[in-house]
Amino acid sequence: MKIKQILTNRNLSNGKDYGIVNEWEDVFSQLLDVPLYYDDWKRRDKTLFWKFPWLASFYQTSIPTFAYVMLPIASPHGNNKKNIIPCMIDFYCREKDELQQFYKRYDKCPLVLISSKEAYDFLVSIKCPLNIKHLPLSISDKYRINDKTIFNKKYDVVMLGRQNAVLQAFLNKYSEQHHDVTYVYGKKEGHGFRYFDQSGQDLGCMSTREDYMNLMRLSRIGLYATPAMDGGRTDTNGFNQVTPRFLEYLVNGCHVIARYPKNSDTHFYELDKMTTRIETYKQFEEAMDRLRCKDVDVSYYSQYLEKHYTSNRVQILSNYLEQI
């Protein structure tokens, strides 16, 4: 099978979560030398398709298409067709009824890609009837670094988006005991965050993908946790996928202090080699003291990231397609 286009909904969606998806789509489009296909929801009666999801397929393209799907059973997107290869970004289905919905939603697709190794292994273990393969998440090649890359740091820690409660509490305690620490934190504002430094200076909303990455690039240390760690997100049904923020920290030259369970996804991304894993405040304090005054090993980072740029995922997909 040969992909002829990449499905995108960038004309309808916004926000940094979809911004990174659009970056992946751009790399797939460029390297496969195929156009982007803009999903046209303007002519669709969403209420009707929510009631009868199978109808959406009649309005979807008939050309061989690759599509990223944010949530596999959340909306009637019409991707259940023999010409569409969907890749599930977030897969949280565990209950029997959810799994049956998932199977039914994609039973016509010749191949269904699962981004989480943990979720993929789970589906294999329960004998998922679909033809599934693992296609990991990535970081766009536009951010590629090499051993000559120089990072100019301004803050010890920059906290972007939702935070792990334990890491947040540890940093609060650390800042009370170490008054020289510099950090950036966010306050919820509308659907996003407004950011401030440790002195209370307003840094703005970082509303674009570029703003987000540029601010992260100023941080020496990133605090990272998988989504369900410490009771963080309950909607993941216990799945603890490694999210792209981990790769964003690395490509922006940040040390990573992390909390995560050991599973096949954290093993795939080698978090044990690429982060300082902590359990207690004492471990956190020791890691902060050490990493605040230490540069990252850019050569080590660049070698690791070569395995996780989006171009690598394009090659994996191409290999899968040769088997169809």
Question: Predicted segments — roles?
Answer:
Residues 146-158, 194-202, 288-297:
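Short, surface-exposed amphipathic charged segments that create phosphate/polyanion-binding patches used
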Residues 22-28, 32, 209-213, 217-321:
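Catalytic binding pocket for nucleotide-activated donors in carbohydrate/polymer assembly enzymes
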Residues 42-46, 94, 140-144, 188-194, ...:
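A short acidic, often aromatic-flanked loop/helix-cap motif at beta-alpha or helix-coil junctions
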Residues 1-126, 259-263, 314, 323-324:
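N-terminal pre-catalytic "stem/leader" segment of glycosyltransferase-like enzymes
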Residues 141, 202-206, 237-238:
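Short gly/ser/thr-rich secondary-structure transition/capping motifs
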Residues 41-49, 191-201, 224-233:
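Flexible internal linker/loop segments at domain or repeat junctions
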Residues 194, 199-218:
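Conserved active-site histidine-acidic residue motif and adjacent donor-binding/catalytic loop
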